[in-house]
């Protein structure tokens, strides 16, 4: 899906810059200046899709009242390990782990839902945990955290052997998921920010849906409709 989207963007004259870091967005005469490691460019409109805390860091000119409004939305962090196994753990795609002693809350075996030959014969197993950024797991060294995860995996699946692991990756994100509280619909941020030409379209606006690819596309379509751009871009 991402490759196809990239092809379509390029075909319509868009430019995708991978591994670029946006340091600041600020209003200037004629539009918005976007400063990156490579320099500065001016655009008439900017659509911001990362997390709300990153918006607050990147756009210093946001009004104090708007900053306070967005700062009331709490976030959870996430840590994920992906094991490339030579054998399957179970016949199930998704297992929620409710044991309070478990270091992870989900075991996801993707190939039980969809087998992709691009995995090179390996079976990817996702071990995921949502947590507060001040939880010890978030700053724990990866080897120690890996040992905690694998030890508990052996308890859940006694037939599992560590020799099955042919690849291993670890990732974490401080702002992985906004926490939706009571009466959130009354406080859900709009797409338009107080800065002219700057729009926000991110997970805080997917409510009342849950996080997911389909709903992120729906959210983008709603923004394009609000801007009057959907018909032009889909023509």
What do the PLM-derived regions correspond to, one by one?
Residues 1-12, 130-132:
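Helix-loop-beta segment of a Rossmann-like dinucleotide-binding subdomain
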Residues 8, 15, 54, 61, ...:
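Active-site catalytic microenvironments for nucleophilic, acid-base chemistry
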Residues 9-23:
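A conserved beta-strand/loop element that lines the FAD pocket in flavoprotein oxidoreductases
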Residues 16-18, 48, 200:
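A structural signal for the hydrophobic beta-strands that form the central parallel beta-sheet
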Residues 18-20, 26, 169-174:
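A general secondary-structure junction signal
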Residues 20-125, 130-139, 143, 148-160, ...:
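Mid-domain catalytic core of redox enzymes
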Residues 110, 114-235:
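Conserved flavin/dinucleotide-binding core of flavoenzymes
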